[in-house]
Amino acid sequence: MTNTPSDQPLKQANQRGAARLAAVQALYQMEIGGTGVLEIVAEFEAHRLGQELDGETYLKADASWFRSIVSGVVRDQRKLDPLIGSALQDDWALSRLDSTVRAILRAGTFELLERKDVPVAVIVTEYVEIAKAFFEDEEPKLVNAVLDRIAKQIRGERRK
């Protein structure tokens, strides 16, 4: 089967989605295990992105997109966390959230800030879907609401 031009956007989108999921996993692993950014990026690129590990084949991911998200979140965390905190309900602190939810919100907020070429709806939808991969109930709704508020604040638009 050959790649036709119409196949390319779908393939690129799927690889970006896989990169987003891997970035969330890497950010989670960094927070829980205290792993540094260089070590985690090297581990994911060598053993996870498009690789087989413990009988599971990881999706092929856009490695540069993955690196951009992980390194950008680490670099900009002091800017991202207050944005996320201001989008949470008054009685919730970022530290109260599950580590996976924090990783999802940080990655999504980073993309909303830095990836102006990607529509808000795409970013929010992708990270809500990632939340659904880990959680069944309230967390995907929380991710949707928080990223939607942040998008309105920094881009002046909501997910449509």
UniProtKB/Swiss-Prot annotation:
Which organism is this entry from? Sinorhizobium fredii (strain NBRC 101917 / NGR234)
The record lists its disulfide bonds as: none
- Give the UniProt entry's GO cellular component terms: cytosol
Q: What is this protein called?
A: Transcription antitermination protein NusB
Q: Which HAMAP family match?
A: NusB
GO terms, molecular function: RNA binding
Family as reported in the entry's similarity comment: Belongs to the NusB family.
The answer to whether keyword Transmembrane helix applies is no
- NCBIfam families, sorted: nusB (TIGR01951)
